[in-house]
């Protein structure tokens, strides 16, 4: 989640991400990491480096060649500025991957006011979560094919819901009465998601619509699990309970007490095979994974647990993650 609300927790989030990357690299698990954003379209464009992408947001070149050329009525609307930015990959050499992680760390530090400039073409933006879920379906299929995987896990790390989605709709122009393609706000309770011959309905709100999108994407990818890691801001526990955990706890206070005791809560749903909710105040990791390359997976898991020995929330995340990849 490369959104503005992540600014204050991006550094600790990066530490968690790097731990997962190091773990996957040690046991030779292929991975791709993407930042979803609507303010990175200028990456690769022939414009000055010190130009903010929003300075050219209405430029016609935004439409080509990076977005769909044909807009069909009834399809979900994907704005031209949306991007899935590939920030880390297991196909990179070790020194290149280390350099990528260093650049990400410096970017996160710069967002907090460090004494150097951040990359202006990769600033924080909104939260195009629904668009990212749609895109990750194709990206996951591609990874499964190229890496010849039998099982795949998609981990979505965010601190909140995505912004309101829209759909393509033919509309009469106000000026000349000509019918043109526009977009209109989407009502989840009136919307049917179709994937081939399958339909997904029943969403009553935005969060449920997002979950239906996950179900739709999973329906096309066998042996694929979705893991949602939700970083809770102060007071965000009630919202998480209302949207996702009502069927798992009798009262909010029950979930709150478990989170205070363990540092995190874990639930299983039809859409996300595992939901992990963590308070941002407990999201912290300082130690590195100490293990020699080439050792067996059992010892890797032991080293990973040792690294997080005194970190309650980290221990739970590691434990649940190992269960998922077993």
Q: Which stretches of residues belong to each language-model region?
A:
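Acidic, glycine-rich A-domain
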Residues: 2-326
């Amino acid at each position: 989640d490369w959104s503005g609300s992540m600014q204050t927790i991006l550094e600790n989030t990066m530490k968690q991400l790097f731990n997962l990357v190091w773990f996957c690299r040690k046991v030779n698990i292929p991975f791709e990491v993407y930042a979803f954003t609507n303010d990175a379209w200028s990456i690769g464009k022939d414009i000055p480096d010190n130009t903010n992408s929003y300075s050219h947001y209405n430029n016609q070149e935004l439409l080509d060649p990076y977005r769909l050329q044909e807009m069909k009525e009834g399809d979900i609307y994907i704005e031209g500025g949306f991007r899935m930015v590939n920030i880390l990959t297991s196909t990179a050499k070790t020194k290149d991957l280390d350099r990528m992680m260093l650049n990400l760390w410096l970017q996160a530090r710069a967002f907090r006011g460090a004494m150097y400039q951040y990359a202006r073409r990769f600033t924080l933006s909104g939260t195009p979560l629904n668009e990212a879920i749609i895109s990750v379906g194709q990206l996951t299929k591609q990874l499964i094919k190229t890496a010849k995987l039998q099982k795949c896990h998609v981990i979505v790390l965010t601190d909140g819901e995505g912004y309101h989605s829209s759909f393509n709709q033919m509309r009469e122009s106000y000026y000349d009465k000509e019918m043109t393609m526009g977009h209109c706000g989407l009502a989840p309770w009136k919307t049917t998601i179709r994937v081939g011959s399958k339909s997904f309905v029943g969403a009553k709100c935005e969060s449920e619509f997002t979950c239906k999108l996950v179900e739709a994407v999973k329906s096309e990818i066998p042996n694929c699990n979705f893991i949602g890691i939700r970083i809770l801001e102060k007071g965000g526990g009630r919202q998480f309970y209302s949207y996702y955990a009502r069927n798992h706890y009798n009262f909010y206070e029950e979930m709150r007490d478990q989170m205070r005791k363990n540092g995190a809560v874990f639930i299983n749903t039809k859409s996300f095979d595992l939901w992990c909710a963590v308070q941002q105040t407990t999201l912290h990791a300082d130690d590195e994974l100490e293990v020699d390359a080439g050792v067996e997976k059992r010892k890797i898991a032991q080293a990973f647990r040792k690294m997080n020995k005194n970190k309650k929330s980290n221990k739970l995340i590691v434990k649940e993650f190992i269960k998922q990849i077993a």
